[in-house]
């Protein structure tokens, strides 16, 4: 059996994705483990790991670090989860190493296009991620009163531009009587399935996403998903994954007006709200589970 080591962290999306991948890959004859990149490892540990594993998988910036520790290029694979990953690697190391390592992948077509824009000659494989649908499945709420953020409230991109815009969700929801915003911190990924019990809808207000776990998880949990057309939702939204909100950039009022209209409608029409949640959940069942996406990872890692 092929042995793969994900050099990653056990927090946020990285932990969620790589733990799930390790379970799924085993079904296809690939043994996968996780190595915490927040820890230091001795030269002897690196040597032993190199003798044990056939392939080391991490993001573009960390793959250079592994090479410096002694892992040879023919055992290195990188998968970019965001534009930031590729831009940091380019800033520190240029684009040459993409041609030297064994495999180069990205998690979405958005990033495949960005790789070309960034001057990376090697064409990456697209390896989208999924979720465990049954883990997130919940009965939809009976009515719409509680709104949650889809991901972080505030984040600036590589060019110092605010891309999450959680403040727009807050200022919009505060103006709608009977609807409350559920504030939350950065939860460990293992807390997220139960988190969706505390909200009736999830809003993604980003102007930039590479993929988008929150809209997938919320859909599987039977929550109303409202999102700008970013990441996976650019395709999944029109196909049945939720309600598409205008990007509202630079005119943020377009986003706020559309969000208000949708929330008020589903707040006042409970039957329509429940049916919409059920439709979104069924779309998630048919499209988001790891069983729909694991083949691309197996092919990539083999």
Range-by-range predicted roles:
Residues 88-90, 116-117, 130-145:
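Acidic anion/phosphate-binding donor-loop and adjacent secondary structure
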Residues 133, 142-189:
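Conserved catalytic-core segment of nucleotide-activated headgroup transferases in glycan assembly
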Residues 194-199:
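Short alpha-helical donor nucleotide-sugar binding micro-motif in glycosyltransferases
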Residues 207:
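Aromatic "clamp/platform" in nucleotide-sugar-dependent glycosyltransferases that forms part
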Residues 224-227, 234:
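Short hydrophobic beta-strand element within catalytic cores of glycosyltransferases
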Residues 267-301:
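A charged, aromatic-enriched C-terminal amphipathic alpha-helix characteristic of glycosyltransferases
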